[in-house]
C-alpha cells in the first residue's frame, strides 16, 4: 500500500487550481443514464470512484470516453444490472437504480458491501422509489426495481435529510408521469448541480437549493454539455493548509458561495480572506490561527467533510476550541493519530475539546477515512520532522493529485510505493 512521507515544518503559500467536485460528478454521471442523446460533462476530477463509475456505465452498454471531458452516450443501454464486483468498492452505485427504472422500467444494483439490514443506508432510496410507483424486491444481495409503464409523480416527505436519496428521487422523477414534490430535501450545492445538469437535458426542476424540490415529469431527456462545479471540500482543505502554516494562498476555479460557513470560521480564526467570482485568497500574515467553535450540520451550515481539517486547525491554534459532530458517528478517528503527533485533545461523546499547542512532531500515522487522512497529511506539513501517512488510498478516493498540489505550495511530500 502506498504511503506519503512528509517533511516539516513548511509554510504553505502560492496558488492552487481546484478540481471538479467528486460529490457532484458522481450523481451527474449516473444521471446521464436518463439521456437518450450524447452528453459531454466537463471538469470531472480524475479519481478512483469516477473510474469505477465509468466502468460500471460501460458494463450497462453505455459508450463512455474520456479526453479532457467525459462523453457519455446511453442511447444503447441494454443491461440493467450493476454487478457486485464494481459496486462493492463504492456506495454511490445505488444511484444507477433510479435512472434505470425511470427510463427502462427495470434496474438492479447489488447492495453496497456488507450492509447490515437494520442500519441500511439504502432504505431512503428504496422508499422514495416505491412512492414513485416502483416495485422493489431484495433478492440474492440485489435491490431489484421494476415498474409497468412509467413511474408516477408523488408528494414525498423525507424522513431525514439525505443527499443520496434526494438525488435518487429527483433523478427518477424527471421521467415520471405528473409532478413530484420532495419535502425535507437536501440543500447541498452538489444537489443543485445535479438538478441543473438534468435541466440542461430538458428536465423541469425547481426549488433546488431549498428543502422543497418540485419536478414536473417529461417524456424524454436529450443531450447537452455541462460543467461540474468546483470541489468546495478540496477548496476548504487547501485554505486550512495555508491557515495552519501561517501561509498565504489563492484558490483558482473555486466557487466562494458554496463555502460561506467555512469562510466565516476561517475569518474567526484570524484569516484575511478575499473572494472573487471564481477565486478565494487567504492570508495569515505569518500568524497562528485562533481556536474556533464548530458544529457540523446539513448545508448551509458547517459541512461534516471539513470537520477533521478544523479539528487540526484548533489543535495548533491559540486557545481552546470545541468541535461538535452531529452528522456521523465515529468521525473522530483522526484524533488519536493527531495525539500521537503531540496534539492535546479529549473526546466527550460527539465533541472534541481541542487545546491548541505551538507545534506538532512527525510520527507514523494511519489514515482511516477520506477527510481524516487529508488532515493527517496537512499535520505532516507543519509538524517538525518526518511524518509517514499510511493507507492513503482513502485520500486518492477524494483528492486529485493532492501531493502535486501541496508540493507546488512548498510542501516537502512524496508518495512511497507500497509492496
Swiss-Prot record:
One of its GO terms (cellular component) is cytoplasm. CDD domains: UdpNAET. GO terms for molecular function: UDP-N-acetylglucosamine 1-carboxyvinyltransferase activity. UDP-N-acetyl-alpha-D-glucosamine binds at residues 91, 120-124, 160-163, 305, 327. It comes from the Bacteria. It catalyses: phosphoenolpyruvate + UDP-N-acetyl-alpha-D-glucosamine = UDP-N-acetyl-3-O-(1-carboxyvinyl)-alpha-D-glucosamine + phosphate. SUPFAM superfamilies: EPT/RTPC-like. The modification 2-(S-cysteinyl)pyruvic acid O-phosphothioketal is found at residue 115. Keywords: Cell cycle, Cell division, Cell shape, Cell wall biogenesis/degradation, Cytoplasm, Peptidoglycan synthesis, Pyruvate, Transferase. InterPro entries: Enolpyruvate_Tfrase_dom, Enolpyruvate_Tfrase_sf, MurA_subfamily, RNA3'P_cycl/enolpyr_Trfase_a/b, UDP_GlcNAc_COvinyl_MurA. Its EC number is 2.5.1.7. The active site is at 115 (proton donor). It is an enzyme of class 2 (transferase). It is found in: Cytoplasm. NCBIfam families: murA, PRK09369.1. This is UDP-N-acetylglucosamine 1-carboxyvinyltransferase.
Amino acid at each position: 500500500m502506498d504511503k506519503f512521507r512528509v517533511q516539516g515544518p513548511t509554510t504553505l503559500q502560492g496558488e492552487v487550481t481546484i478540481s471538479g467536485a467528486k460529490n457532484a460528478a458522481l450523481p451527474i454521471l449516473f444521471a446521464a443514464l436518463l439521456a437518450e442523446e450524447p452528453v459531454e460533462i466537463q471538469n470531472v476530477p480524475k479519481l478512483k470512484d469516477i473510474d469505477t463509475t465509468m466502468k460500471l456505465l460501460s458494463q450497462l452498454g453505455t459508450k463512455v470516453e474520456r479526453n479532457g471531458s467525459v462523453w457519455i452516450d446511453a442511447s444503447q443501454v441494454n443491461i440493467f444490472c450493476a454487478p457486485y464486483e464494481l459496486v462493492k468498492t463504492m456506495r454511490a452505485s445505488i444511484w444507477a437504480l433510479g435512472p434505470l427504472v425511470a427510463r427502462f422500467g427495470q434496474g438492479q444494483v447489488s447492495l453496497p458491501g456488507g450492509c447490515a439490514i437494520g442500519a441500511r443506508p439504502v432504505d431512503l432510496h428504496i422508499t422514495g422509489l416505491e412512492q414513485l410507483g416502483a416495485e422493489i424486491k431484495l433478492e440474492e444481495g440485489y435491490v431489484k426495481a421494476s415498474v409497468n409503464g412509467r413511474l408516477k409523480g408523488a408528494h414525498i416527505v423525507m424522513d431525514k435529510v439525505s443527499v443520496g436519496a434526494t438525488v435518487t428521487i429527483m433523478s427518477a422523477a424527471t421521467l415520471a408521469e405528473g409532478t413530484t414534490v420532495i419535502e425535507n430535501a437536501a440543500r447541498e450545492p452538489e444537489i443543485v448541480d445535479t438538478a441543473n445538469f438534468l435541466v440542461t437535458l430538458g428536465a423541469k426542476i425547481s426549488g433546488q437549493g431549498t428543502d422543497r424540490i418540485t419536478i414536473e415529469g417529461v417524456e424524454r431527456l436529450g443531450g447537452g454539455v455541462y460543467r461540474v462545479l468546483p470541489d468546495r471540500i478540496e477548496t476548504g482543505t487547501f485554505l486550512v493548509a495555508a491557515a495552519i502554516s501561517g501561509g498565504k494562498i489563492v484558490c483558482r476555479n473555486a466557487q466562494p458561495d458554496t463555502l460561506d460557513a467555512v469562510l466565516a470560521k476561517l475569518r474567526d480564526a484570524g484569516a484575511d480572506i478575499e473572494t472573487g467570482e471564481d477565486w478565494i485568497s487567504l492570508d495569515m500574515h505569518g500568524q497562528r490561527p485562533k481556536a474556533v467553535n464548530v458544529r457540523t450540520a446539513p448545508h448551509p451550515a458547517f459541512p461534516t467533510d471539513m470537520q477533521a481539517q478544523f479539528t487540526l486547525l484548533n489543535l495548533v491554534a491559540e486557545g481552546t476550541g470545541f468541535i461538535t459532530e452531529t452528522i456521523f458517528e465515529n468521525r473522530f478517528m483522526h484524533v488519536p493519530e493527531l495525539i500521537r503527533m503531540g496534539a492535546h485533545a479529549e473526546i466527550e461523546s460527539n465533541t472534541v475539546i481541542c487545546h491548541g499547542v505551538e507545534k506538532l512532531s512527525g510520527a507514523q500515522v494511519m489514515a482511516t477515512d477520506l477527510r481524516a487522512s487529508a488532515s493527517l497529511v496537512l499535520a505532516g506539513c507543519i509538524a517538525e520532522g518526518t511524518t509517514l501517512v499510511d493507507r492513503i488510498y482513502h485520500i486518492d478516493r477524494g483528492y486529485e493529485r493532492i501531493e502535486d498540489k501541496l508540493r507546488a505550495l512548498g510542501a516537502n511530500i512524496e508518495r512511497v510505493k507500497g509492496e
